[in-house]
Amino acid sequence: RGGGNRLSEVLSMAAETNLVANAVKAAVGLPVDEMRDPVYNGHWTEIILHSGRDGIFRALDIAPELESAVVQRDLWVKPGDAVERFSGANKAIGTLVMNFSTREDSEKYMADDSWYSVAVD
């Protein structure tokens, strides 16, 4: 199955193998694409984005020095949309998939989220 929080998609990006397509093919009895042991390029991370309060979404702001680490930005809201304070997965407003060159950088930025903000009025 695809899994929650887009885990299969992130692994597909990191390993350059379409795990979701292969899972569907296997489920319906079709031959799957060749799979190999992955060689990961960097240290991959996914951020689940949410608002800290109810309001109107304005923007997602990311520190300029980290923009190059963002592989995929997937916002499910647009400026002007109403958002609710995060209380569960159904309140998420998007995801960021990131790739860092070192494990230390990945862990550093996951432990401190001050490098991005969800602007809400």
Locate predicted features.
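Active-site "cap" helix and flanking loop/linker of ATP-utilizing ligase/carboxylase catalytic domains
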Residues: 1-55
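Solvent-exposed, flexible loop/coil residues
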Residues: 11-15, 61-64, 104
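Short secondary-structure transition/capping segments
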Residues: 17-32, 71-91, 121
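A structural signal for short secondary-structure junctions
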Residues: 39-42, 66, 87-91
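Generic C-terminus detector
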Residues: 77-121
